[in-house]
Amino acid sequence: MALQQFGLIGLAVMGENLALNIERNGFSLTVYNRTAEKTEAFMADRAQGKNIVPAYSLEDFVASLERPRRILVMVKAGGPVDAVVEQLKPLLDPGDLIIDGGNSLFTDTERRVKDLEALGLGFMGMGVSGGEEGALNGPSLMPGGTQAAYEAVEPIVRSIAAQVDDGPCVTYIGPGGSGHYVKMVHNGIEYGDMQLIAEAYDLLKSVAGLNASELHDVFAAWNKTPELDSFLIEITADIFTKVDDLGTGQPLVELILDAAGQKGTGRWTVETALEIGVAIPTIIAAVNARILSSIKAERQAASEILSGPITEPFSGDRQAFIDSVRDALYCSKICSYAQGMALLAKASQVYNYGLNLGELARIWKGGCIIRAGFLNKIKQAYDADPTLANLLLAPEFRQTILDRQLAWRRVIAIAAERGIPVPAFSASLDYFDSYRRDRLPQNLTQAQRDYFGAHTYERTDRSGSFHAQWF
């Protein structure tokens, strides 16, 4: 039997879909799953008649692959990845390459790269975005590792990635754990996007009184605008058309429990931002919103005890309010992406990743969850100035916020007056106002620190560190 060009371990839905994508693009492959029943079911159904070979032991799996072997691992992050790597180590030869396509923590990837490098084996951490549909029809791929490792898989990843007007949605990210770092921040930005959209929905429903049909119309119209055209806005419009199929006749979205789950990448983004000193308040607000949503019973009890402001029904211009919410959403979105890109820029310096921020925006234009026309503007901003300190300083984004900030502020004020939480909208505006201020009140913070802890302070009128006798 001829040796296969590629190997894939892990046949959950993402693994199955990537296997089918790889085969459809002309590459033969062997698949393996820890449970033989899963492999048998895949071969009897979706892989039937395709150039895919099953293996029922890792020994047979490795023996079926041409050398140098290229093996994509699609298993749960953490211990399961380590277990697969440990099982593969004695079976592989120098020059073979393992690619982790899961949502692994970047520091785990850094460790695995070093461990396997000592054995002459390659290891790549590759972010894969796009969900089940993207895995099958073209995801956004973020491979990190050595340049040689990337070149070994480049023909395959370029073939299976989503294709946009300026090429496949994949690029060499950088060394070590950079691929998984970029995917982590991508997911953090995704958290921000989703929370901002949720807040816009809440405002339109709770203030303007829009029903599901009207909400569909608004989001569908927004999806046709250059600034908000995106996958997440598109699916939001679709969600409002879904009627419960259990006989209630109600919009399904209104019957879904308001307790959001999370798998950890948002929290990781927050943790690493704090570690390296980058402010990402919108993303932090999004993570906190999910945490607060999860304490449903506690919130229900609190709702019986803690009352908000008493307000009159909305009597303003409905369309004007809808337009203002759109402006607030877009301004907040700019700030959220500015935070994510600032985090990537700082991480690139700290970890020596050499990230190309414009290229990252390009590969997110297709296949991934945050794909949006707006990313073209981000790419153009970094192409025009690769050293751009913050997206807020790019001429187009600066002018957009200056033109729309009054509507943005008005929407947040209305939410506050009515007791409607808009943590991500508010955090975005606070970020903008803090970033544009020449002087912040942290001079008082420094005075306090020096008062109680003799931590010293710097002065505005002369250089050096100072300590005052406060008492």
From Swiss-Prot:
Reactions catalysed? 6-phospho-D-gluconate + NADP(+) = D-ribulose 5-phosphate + CO2 + NADPH
Query: In terms of domain of life, where is this protein from?
Result: Bacteria
What GO terms are given for molecular function? NADP binding; phosphogluconate dehydrogenase (decarboxylating) activity
Entry's Gene Ontology BP terms: D-gluconate metabolic process; organic acid catabolic process; pentose-phosphate shunt
User: Which Pfam families does the entry link to?
Assistant: 6PGD, NAD_binding_2
Its function, per the record, reads: Catalyzes the oxidative decarboxylation of 6-phosphogluconate to ribulose 5-phosphate and CO(2), with concomitant reduction of NADP to NADPH.
This one is known as 6-phosphogluconate dehydrogenase, decarboxylating
Originating species = Synechococcus elongatus (strain ATCC 33912 / PCC 7942 / FACHB-805)
